[in-house]
C-alpha cells in the first residue's frame, strides 16, 4: 500500500528544499487529509476502514496556509481523438509558462513560487535512453488561505481563456475537455 502524509512547513523555502529532495516515486497533491501525519492510501473506491484515497472525498483545501499547485499536462496526439492548437503544446519552457501565468494572474508579481517539470516529463529507461521528453509543467504557489484555492483556480481558468491561454481536446470517448493554466 501507498502512504500519504500531511506535513506542515515553517516556510515556503522549507517546502521547496523538501520538494527538491523528494524521490521520483513520490507525488504532491492539492489539499490535505484530515489529520497530520501518515495514513495508508488506497485506490479510490477501494478504501478500507482507516485508509484514504487521493480523492475529493479525503483531500480538502482547508482554511489554513497551503500550496496552490498548477499542473499543466500535455496530451500527445495518440492520447486523444483531436487536439486543439493542431497538436502544438502550449508551453515548452518554464519561462513561457511563467510569462503566460503572469499575464493571466498579474497579482503574482513579486510572489514566491517554484516551477519544475511534471513527474511525467523527461523519463529515461535503465539503459539511460530517454523514453519521454517534456510532458508538462508544475508550478507551486504559497497561499495564506488554502480554502480559496478552488475559487482561485476557477478565476485563473476564466482569465486564461480570455487571454488566449486556454486549449482543449476531444477525448477518445468523444467529449470535449477544456484546459488552461
Task: Identify the role of each PLM range.
Residues 161-181:
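Flexible helix-coil linker/hinge segments at domain or subdomain boundaries
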Residues 1-137, 141-163:
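Signature for HUH/AEP ssDNA processing cores
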Amino acid at each position: 500500500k501507498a502512504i500519504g502524509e500531511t506535513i506542515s512547513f515553517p516556510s515556503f523555502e522549507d517546502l521547496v528544499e523538501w520538494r527538491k529532495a523528494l524521490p521520483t516515486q513520490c507525488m504532491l497533491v492539492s489539499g490535505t487529509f484530515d489529520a497530520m501525519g501518515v495514513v495508508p492510501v488506497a485506490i479510490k473506491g477501494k478504501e478500507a476502514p482507516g485508509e484514504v484515497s487521493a480523492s475529493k472525498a479525503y483531500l480538502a483545501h482547508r482554511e489554513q496556509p497551503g500550496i496552490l499547485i498548477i499542473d499543466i499536462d500535455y496530451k500527445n496526439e495518440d492520447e486523444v481523438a483531436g487536439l486543439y492548437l493542431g497538436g502544438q503544446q502550449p508551453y515548452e519552457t518554464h519561462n513561457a509558462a511563467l510569462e503566460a501565468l503572469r499575464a493571466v494572474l498579474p497579482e503574482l508579481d513579486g510572489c514566491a513560487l517554484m516551477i519544475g517539470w511534471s513527474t511525467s516529463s523527461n523519463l529515461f529507461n535503465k539503459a539511460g535512453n530517454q523514453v519521454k521528453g517534456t510532458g508538462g509543467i508544475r508550478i507551486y504557489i504559497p497561499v495564506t488561505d488554502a480554502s480559496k484555492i478552488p475559487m482561485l483556480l476557477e478565476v485563473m481558468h476564466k482569465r486564461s481563456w480570455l487571454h488566449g491561454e486556454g486549449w482543449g481536446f476531444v477525448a477518445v470517448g468523444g467529449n470535449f475537455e477544456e484546459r488552461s493554466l
